[in-house]
A protein has these predicted regions:
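Interfacial loop-to-helix junctions that mark the boundaries of transmembrane helices
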Residues: 1-6, 53-64, 90, 130-144
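Hydrophobic alpha-helical transmembrane segments
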Residues: 4, 37-41, 59-68, 93-98, ...
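Helix-loop-helix "hairpin" substructures at the membrane interface of multi-pass membrane proteins
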Residues: 10, 136-210
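Alpha-helical transmembrane segments of polytopic integral membrane proteins
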Residues: 18-27, 46, 73-79, 102, ...
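Hydrophobic core segments of alpha-helical transmembrane domains in multi-pass membrane transport
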Residues: 43-47, 66-73, 101-110, 147-156, ...
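Alpha-helical transmembrane segments within multi-pass membrane transporters and channels
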Residues: 55-102
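Transmembrane helix-bundle core of multi-pass membrane transporters
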Residues: 84, 91-161, 187-188
Length: 210
């Protein structure tokens, strides 16, 4: 049971990662392999942001900062690597090759700057634990679980209850019909990449802090 409790917070972060992959796949029908590279990059960004202060800022500030960095990174990758493919209406294979290329590029950049060194996030909280019966819950695992569940709940609301969520679902189901209904697919795709980038930023810093 203790192993299950310890794995729940990690599973919640993996859920964020999976949603980031799935939301891009739902629109463009390809697996964005660059998403994993963005997660790694955001983990490093979060680490250096925390470590650059004598007194590290509150953890939510670091999460917000890496989220914004993830959004910027995702939009940049879309602009540089994927937008031209969309304009040329190239086969899905081109997206596949472009995403692998970007993933390798990010990996090599991280290797150049950070090598094989091991970095550890500054302690976010004191290593306190609380008990429910014989089960132990650490403060950081509890925080990671809460943040992940809140983000997933917000995303679920946005996708199901807002106009942009309706537009995303419409483009995912039938891109041609959605264009006839006046939905700007370019804006929807940018929004999807921004959401995926935000999830990469959040999951990267949560994995790093864990």
């Amino acid at each position: 049971l203790q192993l299950l409790v310890s794995g729940i917070s990690l599973g919640a972060v993996y859920a964020l990662i999976a949603v980031g992959f799935a939301i891009v796949f739902s629109i463009l029908k390809f697996s964005n392999f660059a998403h994993g590279g963005m997660i790694s990059a955001c983990a490093f960004i979060g680490y250096f942001f925390q470590a650059s202060f004598d007194n590290p800022p509150p953890f939510y500030v670091t999460v917000l900062f890496t989220t914004l960095c993830g959004v910027a990174m995702a939009l940049l990758i879309d602009t540089v690597a994927y937008r031209r493919i969309r304009k040329k209406q190239a086969p899905t294979l081109y997206y596949f090759l472009a995403s692998i290329t970007v993933a390798i590029l990010i990996e090599q950049i991280l290797n150049v700057f950070f090598g094989k060194n091991i970095y550890a996030f500054p302690a976010v909280f004191s290593s306190t634990t609380f008990h429910i019966g014989s089960l132990r819950f650490s403060s950081i695992d509890t925080l990671i679980l809460v943040i992940s569940l809140v983000i997933l709940a917000i995303l679920l609301y946005v996708i199901n209850k807002t106009r942009i969520g309706l537009a995303i679902r419409a483009v995912a189901i039938n891109p041609a019909a959605s264009r006839l209904m006046g939905i700007n697919s370019s804006v929807v795709i940018m929004t999807v990449f921004a959401i995926a980038g935000a999830l990469a930023g959040i999951s990267g810093v949560l994995l790093g802090a864990k």
